[in-house]
Amino acid sequence: LGFAAGLVALALLPFLGTDFGKGAVRWYSLGFASVQPSEFLKPCFVVLAAWLMAAAQDVAGPPGRSVSFAVALVVVGLLAVQPDFGQAALVLFGWGVMYFVAGAPIALLIALAGAAVGAGVMAYNASEHFARRIDGFLAPDLDPRTQLGFATNAIQEGGFFGVGVGEGQVKWSLPDAHTDFIIAVAAEEYGLVLVLFVIALYAAIVMRSLWRLMRERDPFIRLAGTGLVAIFAAQAMINMG
């Protein structure tokens, strides 16, 4: 039910959503707040895909792996329309990790990874928004007027111990200071010490979760947990990197 609701919300975004001037229609504006359906859809998708893959392990079970892949393609397609290729990549990554844990052949996973890279190249050539984001990230000379430039400067200004609580300036320059660039804000005010603590905390959560899942015998719990941890870890690395 949660997946169905999230899928409908994602499908209606091009008609009822807003981009807040950022070039990608990813949110619903509620006036007092905004909602990004993909954030709710990801865990629901993982649970559904895990259930399908686990059911496929029964002798008389459904073709869960194929069905879960088809569902993943639907989700990725809706995300590409926004366009939100980052979230689409996370969905495919989470599905790929679950498929690997479910016993997928390595050769097939390599082929799927190659197809994903090819799709990324096509997206780069087809989407000006996506190409601009990639070019900005890979540019050897970072433009200090971009969000990435502001964030990098904030981290440098923070040093080891930071400039002090509430003394940071980058939060006034970044529209996403409270989400995508929260680490840059924290690094400027609290320094590298806090950043290293946050990284260690994320690493501890991921390692502890994987250790627990390695001992799990229920295939559904093992697959769902692995998919959730994979997306959690990948998104943390992207936002902190």
Residue ranges of predicted features:
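Extracytoplasmic/periplasmic regions of membrane proteins
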Residues: L148-G164
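Long extracytoplasmic/lumenal interhelical loops at the membrane interface
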Residues: G159-V193, L213, F220
